[in-house]
């Protein structure tokens, strides 16, 4: 069980980190492109 956690936690952390790093520049680019008048 502990082995599974040791393997799984870094993978989840890496996936979360990558997701955040992908979303943040995309959101900044979105704001640059459309400004305040967002379609939703």
Swiss-Prot record:
A family per Pfam: PsbY
UniProt superkingdom: Bacteria
A single GO cellular-component term on record: photosystem II
UniProt keyword terms in alphabetical order: Membrane, Photosynthesis, Photosystem II, Thylakoid, Transmembrane, Transmembrane helix
Transmembrane portions of the chain: 4-22
Alphabetical list of InterPro entries matching this protein: PSII_PsbY
Presence of the UniProt keyword Membrane in the record: yes
Keyword Transmembrane: yes
GO biological process: photosynthesis
GO molecular function, a single term: manganese ion binding
Subcellular location: Cellular thylakoid membrane
Topology with respect to the bilayer: Single-pass membrane protein
Family named by the database record: Belongs to the PsbY family.
Record function comment: Loosely associated component of the core of photosystem II (PSII), it is not always seen in crystals. PSII is a light-driven water plastoquinone oxidoreductase, using light energy to abstract electrons from H(2)O, generating a proton gradient subsequently used for ATP formation.
Subunit structure comment from the entry: PSII is composed of 1 copy each of membrane proteins PsbA, PsbB, PsbC, PsbD, PsbE, PsbF, PsbH, PsbI, PsbJ, PsbK, PsbL, PsbM, PsbT, PsbX, PsbY, Psb30/Ycf12, peripheral proteins PsbO, CyanoQ (PsbQ), PsbU, PsbV and a large number of cofactors. It forms dimeric complexes.
Name under which the protein is recorded: Photosystem II reaction center protein Y
Organism: Prochlorococcus marinus (strain SARG / CCMP1375 / SS120)
Underlying gene: psbY
């Amino acid at each position: 069980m502990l082995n599974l956690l040791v393997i799984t936690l870094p993978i989840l952390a890496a996936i979360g980190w990558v997701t955040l790093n992908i979303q943040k520049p995309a959101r900044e680019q979105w704001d640059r492109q459309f400004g305040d008048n967002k379609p939703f």
